[in-house]
Amino acid sequence: MKILHLSDTHGCHRRLRDLPEADVVVHSGDFCMVGSEQEAIDFLNWFCDLPYRHKIFICGNHDDCLYGANIDGLDDNVHYLCNSGIEIEGLRFYGVPMFMSDCITDCQSRNYEKIPGDTDILITHSPAYGILDYDDGINYGSEEILTKLSDLHLKAHLFGHIHAQHGIKEQNGVIFSNGSIMNANYTIFSTPNIIIVENA
């Protein structure tokens, strides 16, 4: 399966042109800048119109307008994952958002703990600690995700959040993809990541 991975478009999704072919497109959060409902609606209209067989997205810390939202009316091939999963062509995707209301309580840690053990492709907004998470001399990734990774047998982990670490890394047989499109200054677009994952 060919996956197009992007993240952290921060309201500039319509500036993306000539996206490459893929079977599935995944957006791992921060499609908004200020978190307004209007931003989210514009993103959803754009995302739903993309010409991919399946489209998956989660929310990041800039997307709080969707906290607790029940998103109805999406096309059958558009999947909003909020501490939930979906199986596509034998591969099990699971998505954990990053809402600020959860981050300031212990809810976020509990959400990570609940990631199913049979997950093939994990989608989070935050990276795991020490993996494509470095900026300004600090590793900003989640230690809870890093701990959970040891319990999983992933094929890939897709995330964003740390703009300075856009890229792909393979470690212990797992593909790690930081799909952040914007740089640290919110000015330059990076090329979306393409990863290949073997179907189950």
Regions inferred by a protein language model and the residue ranges of each:
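Binuclear metal-dependent phosphoesterase catalytic core
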Residues: 85-89, 144-152, 156, 163-200
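Core catalytic region of metal-dependent phosphoesterases/phosphodiesterases
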Residues: 6-88
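Core dinuclear metal-dependent hydrolase active-site scaffold
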Residues: 1-16, 82-116, 181-200
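A short secondary-structure junction signal
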Residues: 104-107, 126-127, 131-137, 169-170, ...
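Active-site neighborhood of phospho(di)ester-bond hydrolases with catalytic His/Asp-centered motifs
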Residues: 5-7, 25-30, 55-61, 81-82, ...
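Short, solvent-exposed loop/turn segments at secondary-structure junctions
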Residues: 10-11, 32, 63-64, 98-101, ...
